[in-house]
């Protein structure tokens, strides 16, 4: 029988070329499988006894060694023969050899999730959304109180030396970065344009002054938006948000919640949340189009002017 690192396989119409375990530092050595730390139960205990001992979902979560996604792999980006694998705990850089066999070059431990990655030239862009993220990539978390040490947004790394990636820029955002999409660049002005999709909670404006939550009638809210980020290739430290358009707004009424406002569609239908965020945006540059997966909606944007995306209804 297969175990954690030598699992048995079932495969159809595919060929497994190679399989690599997570590098050191990219998993919890006390819980390498990432499972919940469940206490052993007496197999002879009757059902009634089990019910008495059972904990709530919240209490069970507190008993885990580490949250289930703390070390999960998420996204892969490529540049020539280089492969970068993002994760909730940082990223790993591999060199691809003949036959597609990857060899680890370096690992960067930088927690915060989700770890969505893109590569443009010698710059690696990474999404960070969790409240444990820190500006300095530390593993100790950032606490529960507002602090300038917390980081949620877009990180930029210089990977010109694959063995020694260096963080050269950050962009703090109100809802972090679940995913991001490189829209264009670098153009003649030497700038990369990125669309950021934040789906996490809105941070306290004591921590970031421009952030406001769901306050009725307050159009400053960080909800119902994407962020347009500009990255100067020659000086990524000057990267910034240039605008945060309300892409779900009703053009006639100006209401920010211009699409689905939440609820159900009638008897025996599921209840869904209001459309106020995008999970991911895919870009089709030659057609000047972007497609967003946004709270259950598939949305097309005209990005002829990438600084001013227009929703196509």
Segment roles from a protein language model:
Residues 1-313:
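Feature marking well-ordered beta-strand scaffolds used for ligand recognition
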């Amino acid at each position: 029988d297969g175990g954690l690192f030598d699992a048995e396989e079932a495969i159809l119409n595919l060929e497994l070329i190679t399989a690599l375990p997570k590098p050191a530092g990219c998993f919890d050595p006390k819980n390498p499988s990432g499972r919940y730390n469940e206490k052993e139960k007496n197999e002879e205990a009757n059902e009634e006894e089990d019910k008495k001992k059972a904990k709530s979902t919240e209490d069970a979560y507190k008993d885990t060694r580490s949250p289930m996604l703390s070390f999960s792999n998420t996204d892969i980006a490529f540049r020539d023969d280089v492969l970068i694998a993002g994760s909730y705990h940082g990223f790993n850089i591999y060199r691809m050899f003949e036959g597609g066999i990857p060899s680890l070059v370096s690992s960067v431990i930088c927690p915060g999730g989700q770890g969505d990655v893109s590569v443009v030239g010698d710059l690696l862009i990474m999404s960070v959304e969790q409240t444990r993220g820190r500006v300095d990539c530390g593993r100790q978390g950032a606490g529960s109180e507002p602090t300038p040490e917390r980081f949620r947004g877009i990180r930029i790394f210089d990977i010109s030396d694959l063995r020694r990636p260096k963080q050269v820029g950050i962009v703090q955002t109100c809802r972090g970065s679940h995913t991001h999409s490189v829209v264009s660049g670098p153009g003649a002005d030497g700038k990369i344009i990125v669309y950021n999709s934040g789906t996490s909670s809105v941070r306290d404006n004591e921590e970031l002054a421009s952030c406001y939550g769901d306050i009725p009638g307050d159009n400053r809210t960080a909800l119902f938006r994407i962020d347009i980020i500009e990255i100067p290739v020659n000086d990524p430290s000057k990267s910034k948000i240039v605008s945060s358009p309300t892409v779900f707004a009703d053009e006639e009424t100006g209401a920010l919640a211009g699409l689905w406002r939440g609820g159900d569609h009638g008897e025996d239908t599921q209840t869904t949340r209001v459309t106020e965020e995008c999970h991911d945006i895919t870009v089709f540059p030659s057609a000047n189009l972007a497609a967003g997966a946004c709270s259950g909606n598939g949305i097309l944007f005209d990005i002829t002017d990438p600084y001013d995306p227009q929703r196509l209804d």
